[in-house]
Design a protein with these regions (language model features):
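Hydrophobic/aromatic beta-strand elements that line small-molecule binding cavities or substrate pockets
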Residues: 74-76
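Basic, Lys/Arg-enriched alpha-helical interface segments
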Residues: 1-71, 80-84, 91-120
Length: 120
């Protein structure tokens, strides 16, 4: 059984830019997303880890391999229909803590906006 994977506009724009800028890393992200589609919520470390300090208790990060010196992360959560929603992606290399501090609130808002829209 394949799990459904949905994306936000923010994730789609980031991934499109990644394909142009760093095809090797984009390929590794695509492989990690394929694993998520295959395993769903059962996918764990090292590819998936729970985000600490989020208001959304089930916010997670996808941790694909990355090319060169990049440390690609994709923040995601499973929605009420158990589809994986890829919220946003980025490269945290060189600013590990700041990347989370800046992006977790954005991911939380994207998720809340998505679930509110889905309820309408």
């Amino acid at each position: 059984v394949a799990w459904s994977v949905k994306v936000t506009e923010e994730y789609a724009a980031w991934f499109t830019a990644l394909i142009k800028d760093d095809l090797a890393s984009a390929t590794q992200v695509a492989e990690a997303v394929a694993a998520l589609r295959e395993e769903g919520p059962a996918l764990g470390r090292p590819l998936v880890d729970r985000i600490q300090g989020s208001r959304i208790h089930h916010l997670k990060e996808l941790r694909p391999g990355s090319a060169a010196r990049s440390e690609i992360r994709v923040l995601f959560a499973f929605d009420p229909t158990r589809s994986a929603l890829l919220l946003l992606g980025g490269d945290k290399a060189g600013n590990w803590q700041r990347w989370y501090k800046e992006n977790i609130p954005i991911a939380e808002q994207l998720y809340l906006d998505y679930t509110a829209q889905a309820e309408e």
